[in-house]
């Protein structure tokens, strides 16, 4: 977790996104890179005077918002006491291993989510806010683009900034490829955690290893992990994961995203959808 990408848009959870990234950077000596995520402009310019003026006004508004995003990012990093690195500066391998947390702002990046999906492939993880339905919430498209297009994990910041991260880790295990990838990406956190719990829920499993098997596998990596398999009841697997996370004192949840199809979860609900709607702790996700 030596490099973190923070796409910055103006939403209510932005302070939590910054705080989450800083907590990870302090834990691993990471470089945090911020970019302004702007909507893609239309691929054509209207030829009439009114349409052309509207397009120009929208472009100017987007540029002003990007400048505001950069100022907020820099202010948050400075307030956290992180030193600044200039964009384009190379990381020396020998120095990077022992470097402390630091940040840089990357100006003038292309607009649109397509850029984010591609650029995020260069980073250990991308930190985004938990999406919501309110106008001031982070956009679902930002989360999904980074999740599906980057090939890297997503660290989901809760609406309220966390006080700590990575001391008590809960793995929401369902036997799937997606969760196996999330666990693999989370190994830096798991190796440093004080407590790890592998949790499975009856009714939330797909064919695959059990929670007990995962705990044994982690032991071979030098990680002590407890395991628990909860029986089916009136609560859904998503509710069981979050309820147990709260009782465990979890400050980081590990979860594979969309083991069931995204469309199915949109219609019928599912663990990923429940966590996206209700998680109050940081969540590391992979697809």
Residue ranges and their predicted role:
Residues 48-50, 170-171, 241-244, 269-270:
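Short low-complexity, flexible loop/linker segments enriched in glycine and/or proline
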Residues 69-81:
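Ordered, amphipathic secondary-structure segments that act as subunit-interaction surfaces
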Residues 1-56, 149-152, 159, 163-232:
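Small/aliphatic-rich secondary-structure junction motif
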Residues 78-126, 222-253, 257-266, 273, ...:
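Structural beta-alpha unit
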